[in-house]
Amino acid sequence: MIADKVAVIAGTPYDSGLGAELLRAHEVTARPYAMADSPDEQDSLQDQAPGQLAVSFHRLLDQLRQQRVELTMLFCNSLSSVVNHDDTVLPVISPQTVYREVLPQLRSSLVLGGNAHALLGVERTARLISPGHRMLGVSDPMLVRGIENGDPATAFAASQLASTLRRAEQLGLEAVILACTHFTAIGPAIAACCQLPVIDVGSLLVERTVAAIRKGPPGR
């Protein structure tokens, strides 16, 4: 194995587990940590108790540091927009890491999020580093719940997202950004019905985390 442990923090057991599974496929040992038990609880915390959520997040980071965890992957787009993680006791690789890399390379995009907080995270980053970027956002919480129920293919078909993707092509947008780590599970289906480049933030998060682990901390 390449590393002792990476902590994968996400909104629900599904996406924290998915992130850990993807890291293990790269021979990186990882342990999932969910901030909520379900998408409904996650959305409620983000909407009604963001301060409480932030306290819980930073308390978890403190505990992980005491366990000598060296790196955290924040595998949830909406959570990353709600909790401030610019100054933390552990290094955090998050969706913002990916946004800062890809947005300056694009003039426009269709952003697909699991809730409005995920869209806000992309919009906020674009405003700061690429203010000329044209972003159209679609939030589909029901698709997230369908994926969590165990049948991503059926959930994707029921969402009628394919028609939205075709509309993005007609509008001349440059790319589709999957700003929900749940959507990594349906990335191939999205790519199959869309001619635009698909930027899967979840997969890129895994790539950045694996690269950071292989590089190791300074002085290793």
Regions found by a protein language model. Give the residues of each.
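Non-catalytic structural scaffold of enzyme domains
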Residues: 1-220
